[in-house]
Swiss-Prot record:
The presence of a 'disulfide through disulfide knot' structurally defines this protein as a knottin. Residues 21-41 form a propeptide. It comes from the Eukaryota. Belongs to the neurotoxin 19 (CSTX) family. 04 (U1-Lctx) subfamily. Pfam families: Toxin_35. PROSITE patterns: SPIDER_CSTX (PS60029). InterPro entries: Spider_toxin_CSTX_knottin, Spider_toxin_CSTX_Knottin_CS. GO terms for cellular component: extracellular region. It comes from Lycosa singoriensis. GO terms for molecular function: toxin activity. This is U1-lycotoxin-Ls1b. Expressed by the venom gland.
Amino acid sequence: MMKVLVVVALLATLISYSSSEGIDDLEADELLSLMANEQTRKECIPKHHECTSNKHGCCRGNFFKYKCQCTTVVTQDGEQTERCFCGTPPHHKAAELVVGFGKKIFG
């Protein structure tokens, strides 16, 4: 029985060592991915800023990604143009309010 335990311990050690090298490789890949995401996050459009030219480039808020909300603006010349800004849609505001309220009560 003792021999079986020694063999199992040896196998567990070998498996953990070989998987740790694989994990190191995965951690390096994950770090590169996080750095790329951070660069993308820096390039995103903040809340209340104009997103007319890039409607899918809004940043993330606390819980949800901001949505590009557009309105039609009529100039003094009578021209209609579309102006867009990054903001929180009403249903996301409601969800954030409920979550915030829940955190205050249960948190």
